[in-house]
């Protein structure tokens, strides 16, 4: 425990990035949606950070949703989606600014950043988006580019405020969405990479989240291996088989995060059951590792489960 007291959470998170020196401390963090906005969201994030003892402040992107003034009924309508100015993101920037002020001296501030695809499926139902991509990918791409440029405005503003990094998400390539590689590359990966390469140029600590909330992936390695991110938060399965954290580290050749099922013992069990599940992950975890879940945990997950699991990670190698 001496190392924990001697080093700040910021320092301990940075040590995970050093692939040449396995750290003796395993950071940990779990995320949930709080269902509130504004000052209530500031308080909810801070209360959760301190109650769980997690190693960084991860800010949700729940302050606003992309809504279109003109309906998107055909692929050609995607070109009507405007490029949103920085001012449109003010509710999210307000939350970020206040959390930076309150917690940055203590821990890294990591802002969730939805992908262009994730924002697009706020504007229309996901099945409409997928249908439009299959009908006319080039037309849809015009709207995806505008959404990407909008998100770049948010990234630039967040970087100026002093955010340490982003929790960068990708979706859309699932077997039940846009699995076709050519369509995926044109309408999803092209814009993910455009956005996330800019992110990596502006802030130092980015976590790439490959989200399987909507479905599973085939061709996982070739689809995602070249995505940017200092750390990769991976699903628990890919290509119809389990994906261990050690195997994920071999694929991405950088630190990985995850290991626990978001709706498993961490959300629904007792503290002892949550710790037992975490222990199995820690036994085979790669050297450079952050314990977490495959996505957000249940909003009613017991704080005692989360804190017990995080404490176990902190003490596992010390």
Residue ranges and their predicted role:
Residues 1-31, 44, 55, 84-318:
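Active-site loop segments of alpha/beta catalytic cores
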Residues 15-80:
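N-terminal capping/small domains of soluble enzymes
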């Amino acid at each position: 425990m001496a190392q924990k007291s001697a080093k700040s959470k910021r320092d301990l998170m940075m040590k995970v990035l050093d692939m040449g020196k396995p750290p003796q401390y395993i950071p940990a963090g779990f995320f949930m949606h709080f269902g509130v906005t504004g000052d209530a969201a500031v308080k909810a994030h801070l209360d959760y950070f301190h109650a769980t003892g997690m190693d960084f402040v991860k800010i949700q992107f729940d302050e606003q949703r992309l809504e279109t003034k003109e309906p998107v009924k055909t692929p050609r309508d995607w070109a009507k989606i405007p490029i949103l100015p920085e001012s449109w993101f003010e509710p999210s920037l307000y939350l970020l600014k206040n959390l930076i002020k309150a917690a940055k001296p203590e821990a890294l501030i990591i802002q969730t950043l939805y992908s262009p695809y994730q924002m697009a499926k706020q504007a229309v139902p996901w099945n409409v988006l997928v249908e439009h991509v299959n009908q006319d990918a080039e037309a849809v791409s015009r709207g995806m580019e505008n959404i990407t440029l909008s998100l770049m405005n948010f990234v630039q503003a967040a970087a100026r405020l002093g955010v340490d990094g982003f929790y960068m998400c990708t979706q859309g390539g699932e077997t039940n969405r846009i699995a076709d590689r050519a369509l995926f590359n044109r309408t999803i990966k092209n814009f993910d990479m455009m956005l996330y390469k800019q992110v990596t140029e502006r802030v130092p600590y980015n976590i790439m989240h490959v989200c399987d909330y909507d479905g599973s992936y085939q061709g996982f390695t070739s689809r995602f291996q070249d995505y940017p991110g200092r750390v990769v938060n991976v699903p628990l399965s890919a290509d119809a088989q389990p994906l261990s954290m050690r195997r994920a580290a071999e694929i991405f050749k950088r630190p990985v995060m995850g290991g626990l099922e978001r709706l498993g013992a961490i959300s629904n069990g007792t503290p002892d059951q949550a710790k037992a599940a975490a222990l199995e992950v820690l036994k085979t975890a790669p050297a450079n590792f952050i314990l977490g879940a495959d996505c957000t945990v249940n909003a009613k997950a017991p704080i005692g489960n989360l804190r017990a699991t995080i404490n176990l990670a902190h003490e596992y190698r010390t």
